[in-house]
Amino acid sequence: VDAAVLEKLQAGFKKLEAATDCKSLLKKYLSKDIFDKLKGQKTSLGATLLDVIQSGVENLDSGVGIYAPDAEAYTLFAPLFDPIIEDYHVGFKQTDKHPNKDFGDVSSFVNVDPEGQYVISTRVRCGRSMEGYPFNPCLTEAQYKEMQQKVSSTLSSLEGELKGTYFPLTGMSKEVQQKLIDDHFLFKEGDRFLQAANACRYWPAGRGIYHNDNKTFLVWVNEEDHLRIISMQMGGDLGQVFRRLTSAVNEIEKRIPFSHHDRLGFLTFCPTNLGTTVRASVHIKLPKLAANRDKLEEVAGKYNLQVRGTRGEHTEAEGGIYDISNKRRMGLTEFQAVKEMQDGILQLIKMEKEM
């Protein structure tokens, strides 16, 4: 590892040590011992500990503070990743092994709000990384373009309900751009956390969006992850949304090999998304429960649900609408993760009705 990188690492470590009010998992677990053990290591693609921690060093208000520059980083820098993964994915110990992919009996998922009183929309997404390519910080412009080529040709072969159009961000017309913004489909260049992790290089090369004609199926290409596969619709029919997602993932998987790790499951850029990578969420109005956000958080916590503001992480609830999703992604199957979310949402609705 060259001297300039080591110097930056030392300075970064000092900055973390001095930041007494920093609550990130990076600060909690990057001890002097682990730092000294890892600072000289380099993956075969040339990624160092600096690539792993720089976002968390620059943004001391990070919740987690680390990213994986490539798949090998999860193994090479395991002394730092493993305890952070165990802490975030509560209950997934360093000796545990994530189960094999299992979507389970998809017919057992239901409409959680058949009367349409509470749930505004339902969304299930998963992330995938393409085998043989590193994650954002290590990708070249040529690789971005090559990946886009592979993905867009795979997506354009989808049929039936999944049939749609691929829109590259490069050279996108103002009209198309505005249309995608109005539909809330367009992703922007990364926030300061991703910027600091070097996840936005060569923007917008190789980035794009695919959506089906009904606008219920969406793929983000080379945003935070190589692929974000998303199924969504208005209302509370979780069953329909999940079935659409699983059929899409199965189709894409036939053509594109995904990065998978024996212990950690499907690999993603951010360790919070590992394992199933599945986030099942609803936009939901619970005026009585939500009158007291702490109470809502407490109940949600019992069902391993995460409560966010309307527009996702780091936002407020607009008009009392919350984004509520499964928190656990590791150490359980895709089926179990979505089932846990379904059970929790049904319970929240039941409590709201009884108040």
UniProtKB/Swiss-Prot annotation:
SUPFAM superfamilies: Glutamine synthetase/guanido kinase, Guanido kinase N-terminal domain. InterPro entries: ATP-guanido_PTrfase (IPR000749), ATP-guanido_PTrfase_AS (IPR022415), ATP-guanido_PTrfase_cat (IPR022414), ATP-guanido_PTrfase_N (IPR022413), ATP-guanido_PTrfase_N_sf (IPR036802), Gln_synth/guanido_kin_cat_dom (IPR014746). L-arginine binds at residues 63-67, 224, 270, 313. Residues 118-355 form the Phosphagen kinase C-terminal domain. Gene3D superfamilies: ATP:guanido phosphotransferase, N-terminal domain (1.10.135.10), Glutamine synthetase/guanido kinase, catalytic domain (3.30.590.10). It is an enzyme of class 2 (transferase). Residues 8-90 form the Phosphagen kinase N-terminal domain. It catalyses: L-arginine + ATP = N(omega)-phospho-L-arginine + ADP + H(+). GO terms for biological process: phosphocreatine biosynthetic process. One of its GO terms (molecular function) is arginine kinase activity. GO terms for cellular component: extracellular space. Its EC number is 2.7.3.3. Keywords: ATP-binding, Kinase, Nucleotide-binding, Transferase. ATP binds at residues 121-125, 184, 228, 279-283, 308-313. It comes from the Eukaryota. Belongs to the ATP:guanido phosphotransferase family. Monomer. This is Arginine kinase. The lineage of its organism: Eukaryota, Metazoa, Ecdysozoa, Arthropoda, Crustacea.
